[in-house]
Regions:
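Structured catalytic-domain cores with a bias toward divalent-metal coordination
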Residues: 1-133
Length: 133
């Protein structure tokens, strides 16, 4: 039996705030988020593509590249964005992050430089290691 997800309509009307970017219902936005620094001191970024319907509904987070050596999810997420799959969203919100583990992707590795697996480190902490931030 399928259960319907109840959505608080008042809460849905509130903006989603990602790194000082405000996304309201009915908007779509690509947000650049800091993902750390290289030894050269150059910053690395990840991109979150946020699509919000005007109609309340569930929020789906789609992340590719959690493990840098598994690239299928990266391509699926990118193709869905390029094909504009989410632009006609009837209800709810989709947040798509095509490549989460930039360090692992560059090095074709599951781990980040401190040897940890992102998939074993949720929810993280701002005072933690590179991975936990």
């Amino acid at each position: 039996m399928t259960e319907l997800i109840k959505v608080d309509e008042k809460r849905y009307a509130e903006p989603i705030i990602l790194d000082n970017n405000i996304i309201l219902p009915g908007q779509e936005e690509t947000v650049r988020l800091s993902a750390g620094r290289l030894p050269s001191d150059n910053r690395l970024y990840i991109y979150a593509h946020v699509y919000r319907s005007v109609n309340p509904g569930p929020t789906v987070l789609m992340m590719g590249g959690v493990h840098g050596d598994e690239i299928n999810g990266v391509m699926v997420a990118r193709n869905m964005i390029e094909e504009k799959v989410f632009e006609k969203l009837n209800r709810g919100t989709v947040i798509s992050v095509p490549l989460l583990n930039v360090f692992g992707f560059i090095n074709f590795s599951r781990e980040v430089p401190d040897g940890k697996d992102i998939n074993r480190s949720f929810p993280g902490t701002m005072a933690g290691s590179l991975l936990q931030e």
